[in-house]
């Protein structure tokens, strides 16, 4: 049975991560210790009651791919929907795209609980967060507007497409390439042997 270490996480946020200083940054004024405690308590409840119970069942009845259809472990789809609807996917994402705009310090503590409760389930949110981060860092305004709200809302998810047959996960040996097309899309050439949360 998973029990989230809320007091320990709050201690780390206050004493080590400097949450009180972060709350002085413009835009984060409402993200002090009181807000962090309330958010962490709710995250603990969600992870203990919804995410952790799927850990064992996910190992027993794992996801599959058959006839071109991907099936997740029982309960994962519903749990991810609840995660998105509860605002957990957008916790540290900008409000302009549907996120809550909280500091990453709070987001990281909540993610720590999800990872500890069920690593397999957490990968979907982690990879979706990575896709959002990549778009925020390097995406055009058009791409951000098109993709980020759907990722935050749980309509779409991110994946990791790294492992290639000739390279494993050695990026220097990966041969997959993307060629721009005239309509603004890209055509991919290459192979992948594992796609995390594909």
Task: List each model region and its residues.
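Short, well-ordered loop/turn and helix-capping segments at boundaries between secondary-structure elements
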Residues: 18-19, 116, 133-141, 153, ...
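A glycine-rich phosphate-binding loop feature that marks nucleotide/adenosyl-phosphate handling sites
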Residues: 64, 128-131, 153, 164-166
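N-terminal glycine-rich flavin-associated loop
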Residues: 123-141, 168
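Amphipathic, small/basic residue-rich leader segments at the start of a protein or domain
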Residues: 1-123, 142, 146
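Glycine-rich, Trp-frequent "lid" loop and neighboring beta-strands that shape
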Residues: 92, 100, 142-198
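Short, mixed-charge aromatic SLiMs
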Residues: 66-75, 137, 154-159
